[in-house]
Each structure stands twice: as C-alpha cells, then as structure tokens.
C-alpha cells in the first residue's frame, strides 16, 4: 500500500502513459490509485478477520458486516459524487473498508475469538517499521530516478521495475532483521 501511495503516478505513467492515455488521464488514475491504496491494508485485514468467523461456521456476521460496508460505501459515494466527482468512489471504498475492519475487530474482541497479545503487537510493530523504512527507501529511489522517468519514455517500465525490486528487497531484509519474520519461516510449496 505504501508503494502504491508513493509511486502511483510513476506506476500509471509506466504502464499506461502512452498514446491517447494523456497526462490528465495519468493524473486522474494515479489519484484514484492512491485513494484505493489507503484501503489495501483494510482489504487484507478483512480477509484475515473474516476467517475467525468462517472457522466457527459463522457466515452470518461476515455477511451482515459486508452489507453494512456496501451500504456505507454507496451512501458516501452517492452523497458526495456531485461535489467530488469520480474520486469519491475510491475514497468511499477505502473508508467503508476501514469501518468494516473496526466492526470486525469489535466483534472479534466481544466474542473473545482472538487475543492480540504481546507477540502479535511485537510482530505488528516490526512489520510497520519495515513498511516505513521501505517507504523512505522507495521515496528516495523515486527522487533519484525522477529525471529518468521524464527523460526516457521507453525505459520507464525498467526504472520502475528496478525501484520495485530494490524496495521489495529492502522490506524483506528489514523485516528479517527487525524480527517481523525470519526467512526460515517462509515456506514455498
């Protein structure tokens, strides 16, 4: 999500910024991607939180919470579309998803389905630290490559790929050293 927020314009420019997809289209799409990116952590958390209920054969509560989220999304979108235009759709999606996360969290705590113990908090803070450091590295790399993005149209994708690989590598390295996870814990099948 941090990468999508910081590099949305470079991503959209590199992938779609050619031909009829002009600078205004790139800017509008990049802004929409940025607002959707704020919801990405919520989308991931919702997938995890819903499993607490599915594992206990409780499909009703996730359904009702999803309905509430959709209604909130629609109400925000419809009520503000006239004032803000298309951009309210990704904003409303992210807001309603975060509200849904807090509702899930409330019901998980209320039903005592999970204890957010010290180990969880330790791993979470280390992961957050890794994301922040990766975001700083990404920001610096975007600054370093900014002239190259503007100068050489045909190499934009290559520069973006290099930035993504370095940022991803830094995230995994920092996560490993900070204790968010260990490389030995990763199992590929």
Language-model features, listed with the residues they occupy:
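Short alpha-helical transmembrane segments in multi-pass integral membrane proteins
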Residues: 1-6, 83, 87-112, 128
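Juxtamembrane/transmembrane-helix interface segments of polytopic membrane transporters
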Residues: 4-13, 77, 81, 89, ...
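Interfacial segments at transmembrane-helix termini and the short loops linking adjacent helices
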Residues: 5-39, 150-151
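Hydrophobic residues within alpha-helical transmembrane segments
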Residues: 35-38, 64-72, 95, 121, ...
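Membrane-interface junctions at transmembrane-helix termini in multi-pass inner-membrane proteins
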Residues: 38-68, 79, 83
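Alpha-helical transmembrane segments
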Residues: 49-57, 105-123, 146-151, 181
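Membrane-interface helix-loop junctions in multi-pass transport and translocation proteins
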Residues: 60, 67-102, 143-165
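Membrane-proximal transmembrane or re-entrant/amphipathic helices at the cytosolic face
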Residues: 115-116, 140-189
């Amino acid at each position: 999500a941090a990468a999508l927020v910081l590099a949305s314009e470079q991503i959209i420019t590199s992938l779609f910024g050619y031909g009829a997809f002009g600078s205004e289209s790139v800017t509008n799409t990049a802004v929409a991607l940025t607002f959707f990116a704020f919801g990405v952590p919520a989308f991931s958390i919702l997938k995890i939180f819903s499993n607490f209920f599915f594992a206990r054969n409780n499909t009703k509560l996730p359904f009702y919470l999803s309905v509430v989220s959709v209604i909130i999304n629609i109400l925000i979108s419809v009520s503000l579309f006239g004032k803000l235009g298309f951009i309210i759709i990704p904003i409303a999606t992210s807001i309603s998803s975060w509200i849904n996360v807090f509702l899930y969290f409330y019901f998980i705590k209320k039903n005592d389905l999970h204890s957010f113990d010290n180990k969880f908090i330790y791993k979470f803070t280390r992961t957050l630290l890794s994301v922040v450091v990766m975001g700083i590295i990404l920001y610096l790399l975007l600054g370093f490559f900014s002239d190259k993005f503007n100068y050489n149209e045909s190499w934009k994708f290559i520069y973006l790929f290099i930035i993504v690989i370095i940022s991803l590598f830094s995230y995994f390295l920092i996560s490993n050293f900070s204790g968010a996870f260990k490389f030995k814990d990763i199992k590929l099948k």
